């Protein structure tokens, strides 16, 4: 999985080694298996981190505009399901606050950048996403922290393996995704 892409963080962040990554995943994320890389800020304790994940969803046509209202509705539905499955209610529930910023697709980089501000009980949380399309799915960079952590997607570079680049799509052999770009956005997890 690690050979799918390379994550280059901005100054002040460090990509964990393979063994450090596995330990971090086991301790903090519960053993998910689609993570390519984990990065921590210098001196970080794990409460603020970045992860690069791979979503092999098939080719997604990028000419469908992103409707933030539809994304917002889908996120709310996902949060309702998360709260129900986790038995969270009232003051302990995970709640939507706002986009921070709203989803925006850049056709030159083939990436969507956006942020979701949440409250988990009384605690604020922020997930920033940079989702870059591939010929067979997407790479998703997720920065996890709080609004006070000063997180930014600036300076992060995601370099996919050359043969996985979006423009390498072969309509004769590559599978197409069943959903749209919006569906792919809604597959992103909240951490």
Where are the model-predicted features located?
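N-terminal leader-region detector that preferentially activates on the first domain or presequence
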Residues: 1, 52, 132, 142-143, ...
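N-terminal mature-domain "stem" immediately C-terminal to a signal peptide or N-terminal signal-anchor/transmembrane
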Residues: 1-11
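Conserved polar/disulfide-associated segments of primarily extracytoplasmic proteins
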Residues: 4, 15-127, 168-191
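Sec-exported extracytoplasmic/periplasmic mature domains
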Residues: 10, 80, 84, 159-163
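Extracytoplasmic/secreted envelope proteins and their assembly/folding machinery
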Residues: 10, 72, 76-79, 151-155
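Surface-exposed amphipathic alpha-helical segments
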Residues: 13, 139-176
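A short, surface-exposed beta-strand/turn
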Residues: 128-139
């Amino acid at each position: 999985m690690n050979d799918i892409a390379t994550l280059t963080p901005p100054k002040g962040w460090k990509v964990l080694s393979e063994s450090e990554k596995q330990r971090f995943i086991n301790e903090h994320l519960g053993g998910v298996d689609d993570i390519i890389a984990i990065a921590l800020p210098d001196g970080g304790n794990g409460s603020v981190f970045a992860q690069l994940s791979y979503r092999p969803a098939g080719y997604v046509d990028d000419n469908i505009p992103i409707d933030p209202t539809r994304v917002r509705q889908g996120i709310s539905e996902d949060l309702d399901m998360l709260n129900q499955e986790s038995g969270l209610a009232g003051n302990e529930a995970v709640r939507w606050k706002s986009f921070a910023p709203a989803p925006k697709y850049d056709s030159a980089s083939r990436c969507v950048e956006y942020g979701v501000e949440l409250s988990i009980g009384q605690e604020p949380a922020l997930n920033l996403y940079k989702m870059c399309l591939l010929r067979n799915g997407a790479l998703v960079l997720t920065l996890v922290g709080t609004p006070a952590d000063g997180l930014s997607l600036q300076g992060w570079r995601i370099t996919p393996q050359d043969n996985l680049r979006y423009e390498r799509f072969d309509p004769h052999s590559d599978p197409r995704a069943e959903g749209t770009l919006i569906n792919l956005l809604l597959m992103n997890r909240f951490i």
